[in-house]
Amino acid sequence: GFSSIFRGVAKFASKGLGKDLARLGVNLVACKISKQC
């Protein structure tokens, strides 16, 4: 079903996108600090 597909995608994403998420987090913090959101 959909949930198993989603779980598979989430597993794949957690491996591949960990760095991207970290970068997004850093960008978000920088954005908040500089108040340019």
From Swiss-Prot:
One of its GO terms (cellular component) is extracellular region. Pfam families: Antimicrobial_2. Keywords: Amphibian defense peptide, Antibiotic, Antimicrobial, Disulfide bond, Secreted. The keyword Disulfide bond applies. Its main location: secreted. It is found in: Secreted. It comes from the Eukaryota. Disulfide bonds join 31-37. Expressed by the skin glands. GO terms for biological process: defense response to Gram-negative bacterium. Belongs to the frog skin active peptide (FSAP) family. Esculentin subfamily. Antibacterial activity against Gram-negative bacterium E.coli. This is Esculentin-2P.
